[in-house]
Structures are given as C-alpha cells and as structure tokens.
Amino acid sequence: MTSTPTKPTVAFAHLGCEKNRVDTEHMVGLLAEAGYGVSTDESDAAVVVVNTCSFIQDAREESVRTLVELAEQGKELIIAGCLAQHFQEELLESIPEAKAIVGTGDYQHIVDVLQRVEVGERVNRVSAVPTFVGDEHLPRQRTTDQAVAFLKVAEGCDYRCAFCIIPKLRGDQRSRPIESIVAEAHQLAAQGVQELILISQITTNYGLDLYGKPKLAELLRALGDVEIPWIRVHYAYPTGLTPDVLAAYREVPNVVPYLDLPLQHSHPEMLRAMNRPWQADVNDRLLDQIREQLPDAVLRTTLIVGFPGETEEHFQHLMGFLERQRFDHVGVFTFSPEDGTAAADLPDRVDPEVAQARKDALMALQQPISAERNSRWVGRTVDVLIEQHNPQTGEMIGRCARFAPEVDGEVRVQPGAEGQQAAPGSLVPVEITGADIYDLNGQMVGARAMVAAIRADA
C-alpha cells in the first residue's frame, strides 16, 4: 500500500484487532487525502504512526516492543490507539521519540496532529472519554485483502465484564444509523468487496443506544440489498440473538449462518464472577435454539480458563459443556489480570501452570470435534473465496463461508478437472474432497461438473 505523495511519506504499523484496523484505515485515508504519502514499510518514512493494542498484557508488550524497535531505528513516532488511550502522557515521558499520542476517539484529527508535529510540537490528542465514531463520510483506505472488508457498526461497550478493560479504552457504546452503515456497505461493494464483516464490541446490541432497542435484525435486512455475496457478523453476544435476529439470518440470502459467540465460560458461578450473570441460563438453551432454526449454522466461541476462583469443578463443567455443544471453532485464553478491571483485585488466583494445563485440555478435547465438524462438508460443493494462487502449480487457497479470516481455517483448492483456476478475489464453486482438524481440501468445479452433479441428484 503506497500512494504518490505531494507531502512527506508517513508509514503505518498496525497492531491489534479488526476494530483497530478500521481506525488505521481511516487515518491512512485522511492523510492520503491531505496529500501525504502513506506506506506500510517503515523504511519509507521518518515518521511512523503506530496504532497500538492494550487489551491484555501480551498485546501491550508487543506494542511497546514495536515502539522501542522503531525508536531505535531513529523514527519519530505518533502513538495511536488503545495504548495511547490507556497510558497517555506517560508514553510521551517514557519514549522521547514519541512526538504525539492520539486516543481511540481522536484518530479523525490525525492530519492536524501530524502538521503540529512537523513544526516541532509534542502533541497529546487524547480525549478523556472517547465519543467519536467514524462513518461513510470519513476517508478510508483499506489495508485488508481486496475482497474482504470490515465495517464498524458501533464503537464502545456498555457492558462491564470483570476481566475487560475495553470500556475504559473505547468508551460507552455509540451506534451508527442504519442508513450510514448501508451507505458504506454500498461503497465497499463498488470497490469489489466479496465479504463484509460487521464488527463492534457487542454487535448484537447494535442500535440500543441510538434507537432505544437493538436493531441488528433490521440492519441485516437492510444489508440484504447490498451486492456483496457474504455478510458475516462478529461478536454476537448470546442474549442478543433474539428470534427476530435468527429469522434475519434465515431470510437474508447474503448473511452467512456463522455465529461468533464469545461465551467465556459455562458455569454460573464463574459467569457471575465475570459480571456476566445474564448469560448463565442462556448458553445451552440458546445453542439448541440456534441449531433448530439454523441447522447449518457454524458456531465459534472463545473461552477463558484460570479466572480467579475457578475450581476443578468449574473447569469440568466447562469441559462437559464443550463436549456437549460441539462447536465448529473454539479459541481458549488463560486469564490475564488487567489493572483497572474488577478482576485484577479478585482473590483465589489460579496457578498459571494449572491455567495453561486447563487450556491445553480444552483444546485437546476440541480438536477431534473440529475435525468431525469439518468432515461433514466432504462431498459438498461450496463457494470458496480465493485469497492466494500459485501460478506455477495452479494451487489456490481460500475460505468457504464456515471460515472467518485470520481466526479459522482455510480451503486448499486444486485446479478443476479441466484445468480451471481462479485469481484472488474470485468466488468460485469447489467440491470438498477432504478435511482435517482446521482446514478443508477441495477441487475447483467447472460448469460441466456442476451440471452433471445436479442431474445426478435429480
């Protein structure tokens, strides 16, 4: 990603989640519109904007390590994102090469910040309480694959989970109007996007602050008119999956039946300790309801082990839940105590070695389940979004709708029987021929094969 500058080139280093990525893309778009060159290669520029993550300690350490490495290369730094929001003036004091800090609610001011840095100022542009949310009018230059785009439907979070610092870093929830989201979706469709991923902190709570009640179902139906084949929803909290939302999943053809459910735990006592008591009587009942209404639904969840007070009984409850519910994809994290969260001061810490052993046990339990869930797709012909192509061998790599980018598996695609191949960004039919724990194998299907298969099934 490089543009022709009329002003100096600014490099970008992106860290953290896809919500952070959208903020990066807006900053890139704003600087490009103002005439700056923008690049992802730090060697191209004297000034580097680092959009940082501060969600957990490991992420903070990665952000600080990146900042120190760039500082030692002699770069001038503009520190943006969650680390800037978290530590603010302390960063300017600790890193002399840091010329500015930009908070999570202030990235729209990046051009002004850079102009002030250019005349020698050290700038602190961090609002105490973030209130801004970008929209379709804010310039944006995407940094993701040409065919995939993330669309932020809301910013911030009204929940106060005991382990999570995000509300302090990004403020309370503030949703965009449906019309604004649909307008941006049309813009992205015009750019050739094939997969649109809706994101926020709690996507199923979309609209609650703006309309007085959640409006995800209405949003999905409105997006049904956008010419993008796949619309995927991330961060669907269980209580927000109402019958109307599940009906929208069924009714809107381009909404893929993929549910990303960050459940965190199954035991009621653990959920109360996590300040998620509303979820305790929902998990099993909701999952049964989802499978009844969306038989082909792909279910992903994330879980936390080693939360303070988690006993062996609590953990075995979670093991039983995982074995019973048979998710397609599971991510497991060990508890990370974060200063400024309620959980940071809780007693009865779990030994880190015990927490790691529990994580390993959950993943060992899940792997054959994931393999079995994948094997159900062998013999089917599905659409695959091609993301890589080897012109020498003809082999392709892509994803079908059951795999979200970066967090799930991939489909390894062989050329069709008549030599058919496809370029990245193409959505093509593929017959699934094999499966393993995480990935699928397949062969591209030509028109003749598709006609023959349909006639054989008739």
UniProtKB/Swiss-Prot annotation:
| Domain TRAM, chain residue ranges per copy | 375-446
GO molecular function annotations of the record: 4 iron, 4 sulfur cluster binding; aspartic acid methylthiotransferase activity; metal ion binding; protein methylthiotransferase activity
- Catalytic reaction list: L-aspartate(89)-[ribosomal protein uS12]-hydrogen + (sulfur carrier)-SH + AH2 + 2 S-adenosyl-L-methionine = 3-methylsulfanyl-L-aspartate(89)-[ribosomal protein uS12]-hydrogen + (sulfur carrier)-H + 5'-deoxyadenosine + L-methionine + A + S-adenosyl-L-homocysteine + 2 H(+)
Binding of [4Fe-4S] cluster 2 occurs at C157, C161, C164
Where in or outside the cell is it found? Answer: Cytoplasm
Q: Which cofactor does it need?
A: [4Fe-4S] cluster
UniProtKB keywords: 4Fe-4S, Cytoplasm, Iron, Iron-sulfur, Metal-binding, S-adenosyl-L-methionine, Transferase
Q: How is the cofactor bound?
A: Binds 2 [4Fe-4S] clusters. One cluster is coordinated with 3 cysteines and an exchangeable S-adenosyl-L-methionine.
- Gene Ontology cellular component list: cytosol
Cite the EC number: 2.8.4.4
This protein's record includes keyword Endoplasmic reticulum: no
Start and end residues of each MTTase N-terminal domain:
8-119
What NCBIfam families does the entry give? 30S ribosomal protein S12 methylthiotransferase RimO, MiaB/RimO family radical SAM methylthiotransferase
Can you say what this protein is called? Ribosomal protein uS12 methylthiotransferase RimO
The organism encoding this protein is Synechococcus sp. (strain CC9605)
- The UniProt gene name for this protein comes to rimO
